[in-house]
């Protein structure tokens, strides 16, 4: 993410870093026995992380749509990153597959499904879902325009809302239809139903960044949208559904949050690019430390909340240590490249 005098990318990097920590919190399991706090942390705060990542990425990608070279370079970079981490988590995928007691000859098919759909580990679903959503939204925008793309992505997102509101839809044909779907495809949190609306929101924000809707009263609009999201959370908390990946107000809260971060003067003069890189290190590496802690502490006589807190601390420290090593390596590579360039210049 390059510095731009128009956009506050420093605050974006900071919030991405904080949301990466929120993802670790979600994957660490239960941190408290008090249900309302557990729900707020895991189902509201934690669920805002990936949408924020998607809206930010698509906002900055929108300007590259007409530059095929930039888009190609971005896609190659993200695919290389995804394939690298898929190889890292291949042993984890094998252990998970083995726990299902399925024949070994089905493992290649399982790897293929994981690679193109579910992810080799529970945080990697985001990349194939983002890429599929990007392809879908780009084709819709190209063929139908932004208005129809917005309506279609919203309708697709509403299909996923069925899992969140399933307790209110008991015995309805909608729920029966969704159950048939989930038996085949496991989840609607994918590149067809989940990511397109957030990609569209990023595109929409880029196109209308200078409109009055996003310029005026931005923090007030964010506060109102977040307040309604909390009310929606209370409704869902009363009767929790099959899963809680989809909140109706989440796309609107996310786009107003990204807009507010891009416009604020807070930290704008600081270079916090390293926090963006650190957030990527945390996001991709934290399951390694969570699973080590889960195995290492399995025999300790701890309650679920205490075990969750311990795993969170271990994963937080371990992934930060990995991030520092990664940043040091990248800086060393950059300095080495600069020295080589200077020698060639001489």
Across the structure, where does each feature detected by a protein language model lie?
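Alpha-helical transmembrane segments and their immediate juxtamembrane cytosolic regions
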Residues: 1-346
């Amino acid at each position: 993410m390059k510095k731009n005098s128009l956009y506050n990318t420093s605050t974006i990097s900071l919030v991405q870093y904080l949301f990466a920590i929120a993802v670790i919190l979600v994957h660490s399991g239960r941190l408290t026995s008090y249900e309302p706090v557990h729900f707020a942390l895991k189902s509201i705060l934690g669920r805002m992380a990936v949408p924020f990542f998607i809206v930010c990425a698509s906002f900055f990608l929108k300007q590259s749509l007409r530059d095929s070279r930039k888009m190609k370079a971005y896609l190659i970079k993200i695919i290389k990153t995804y394939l690298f981490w898929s190889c890292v988590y291949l042993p984890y995928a094998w252990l998970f597959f083995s726990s299902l007691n399925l024949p070994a000859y089905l493992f290649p098919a399982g790897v293929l499904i994981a690679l193109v759909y579910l992810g080799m580990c529970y945080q990697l679903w985001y990349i194939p879902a983002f890429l599929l959503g990007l392809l879908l939204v780009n084709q819709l925008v190209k063929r139908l325009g932004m208005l129809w793309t917005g309506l279609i992505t919203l309708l697709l997102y509403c299909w996923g809302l069925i899992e969140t509101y399933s307790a209110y839809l008991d015995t309805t044909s909608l729920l029966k239809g969704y159950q048939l779907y989930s038996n085949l495809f496991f989840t609607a949190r994918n590149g067809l139903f989940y990511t397109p609306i957030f990609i569209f929101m990023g595109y929409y924000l880029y196109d209308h960044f200078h409109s009055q809707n996003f310029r005026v009263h931005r923090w007030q609009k964010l506060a109102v949208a977040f307040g309604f999201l909390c009310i929606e959370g209370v409704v869902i908390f009363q009767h929790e559904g099959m899963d809680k990946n989809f909140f109706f107000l989440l796309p609107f809260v996310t786009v107003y949050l990204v807009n507010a971060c891009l416009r604020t003067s807070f930290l704008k003069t600081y270079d916090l690019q390293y926090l963006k890189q650190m957030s990527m290190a945390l996001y991709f590496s934290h399951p390694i430390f969570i699973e080590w802690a889960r195995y290492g502490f399995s025999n300790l006589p701890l309650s679920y909340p205490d075990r969750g807190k311990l795993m969170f601390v271990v994963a937080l420290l371990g992934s930060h240590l990995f991030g520092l090593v990664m940043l040091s390596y990248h800086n060393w590579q950059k300095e080495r490249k600069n020295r080589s360039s200077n020698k060639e210049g001489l």
